[in-house]
Amino acid sequence: MLDAFSKVVIQSDAKAAYIGGSDLTALKTFISEGNKRLDSVNYIASNASCIVSDAVSGMICENPGLIAAGGNCYTNRRMAACLRDGEIILRYVSYALLAGDSSVLEDRCLNGLKETYIALGVPTNSTARAVAIMKAAAVAFVTNTASQRKVEVAAGDCSALAAEVGTYFDKVESSI
């Protein structure tokens, strides 16, 4: 995983050039938006269990066969695995948001995820639906439109961060 600073340094070093121009401007923007980014990650982390459990509940409401005998969420062990996977996905999305880079999400979470789910017989359409529900909830927390938020919101527009977190969830959905 490379953060915004490491990327700029590596790119400049490869060109044997000083850091300047648009790279420096982008880093200045990244720093000035840092508190919003930290707050956004905090909103997601502080509400992670609610985000995940609501997503899994929504997935099950739309497909009740998942909790019927033989369903992929039937038995406590399978339900716990489903919740755990949702927590892992959400955690890596928050890491990507913090770094401003999706490589940690792609390398450590999404690489081989679809193949694993197929091998285990996990219905990918239901999983993708749960991810979409998590996306909607996370975006609502970042933009301060969630009805049950637990933390105070810093002043400022977070629509760019909401769009960014949305793209990370889109990557998860498309990889499943």
Swiss-Prot record:
**Per the record, what is one GO cellular component?**
chloroplast thylakoid membrane
Q: What is its main location?
A: plastid
Q: Where in the cell is it found?
A: Plastid, Chloroplast thylakoid membrane
User: Which keywords annotate this record?
Assistant: Antenna complex, Bile pigment, Chloroplast, Chromophore, Electron transport, Membrane, Methylation, Photosynthesis, Phycobilisome, Plastid, Thylakoid, Transport
Q: N4-methylasparagine is carried by which residues?
A: 72
A biological process (GO) annotation for this entry? photosynthesis
Q: Where does phycourobilin bind?
A: 50, 61
* Function (record text): Light-harvesting photosynthetic bile pigment-protein from the phycobiliprotein complex.
Tell me what this protein is called: R-phycoerythrin beta chain
Q: Which gene encodes it?
A: cpeB
